[in-house]
Amino acid sequence: MVEMNFKVDAFEGPLDLLLHLIGQLEVDIYDIPMAEITDQYMEFVHTMQEMELDVASEYLVMAATLLAIKSKMLLPKQELEIDYDTLEEEEDPRDALVEKLMEYKRFKEAAKELKEKEAERSFYFSKPPMDLAEYDDGTKVAELDVSLNDMLSAFNKMLRRKKLNKPLHTRITTQEISIDDRMNSVLGKLNQQKNHRLRFDELFEEQTKEQLVVTFLALLELMKRKLVEVEQSESFADLYVQGKGEELS
């Protein structure tokens, strides 16, 4: 018999103890030698009792389970006439125990892996958030009635239409356009309207691709400064640019 050489409080429960005993014997968990394992387990329980330690009820329940399995395996098998047409494999008394041991082993290995990851994470230090108050110019970003994704979607549709309508042979000319100039142009167009309101795509008529991009950026800047807002009456409806502020009065 393998010498008992472990601490009484080193196990988290009876399944943990059984896994230790099986490991000590270096046997296959699916082929547990019940006589030897049961004897060692009972010796452990007796050691706890001799040391006048409280033996948890779960250890006693497992002891009874092991003794029952050991007894079943010692019983002689009945010799019966075998009907090979209905022959079924006889159930192993250890099956339920092995299933519990394997499940516990999986949980134990998962817990070990999580503990290792926790230890590994302790070597990393999170950087505290930076105070960006000194960079705040006090300008409040306008709350959009439509999302930026809605605007980008509408803008991309215009780019696709521009590409489809583009002639096969074009003459390329370079023309620098500032965002400030385009902002004034957008405000001018809105100011020409009685209600200072234009459909989104009307701001982008007869423009090159480069001009479209500058106009879009100018529109975003105007929204940031709360000089215009983009509205949509319902989902999938046209977008409208509404002017606001002293510049349009």
Swiss-Prot record:
Annotated transmembrane regions: none
Record's keyword annotation contains DNA repair: no
Keywords for the protein's UniProt record, in alphabetical order: Cell cycle, Cell division, Chromosome partition, Cytoplasm
Pfam families: SMC_ScpA
Cysteine pairings via disulfide bonds: none
Domain of life: Bacteria
GO biological process, alphabetically ordered: cell division; chromosome segregation; DNA replication
GO cellular component terms given for this protein: cytoplasm
Cell inner membrane as UniProt keyword: no
Localization, UniProt: Cytoplasm
HAMAP family: ScpA
Subunit comment: Component of a cohesin-like complex composed of ScpA, ScpB and the Smc homodimer, in which ScpA and ScpB bind to the head domain of Smc. The presence of the three proteins is required for the association of the complex with DNA.
Record function comment: Participates in chromosomal partition during cell division. May act via the formation of a condensin-like complex containing Smc and ScpB that pull DNA away from mid-cell into both cell halves.
Family under the similarity heading: Belongs to the ScpA family.
UniProt protein name: Segregation and condensation protein A
Naturally occurring in which organism (per UniProt): Listeria welshimeri serovar 6b (strain ATCC 35897 / DSM 20650 / CCUG 15529 / CIP 8149 / NCTC 11857 / SLCC 5334 / V8)
Designated gene of the protein: scpA
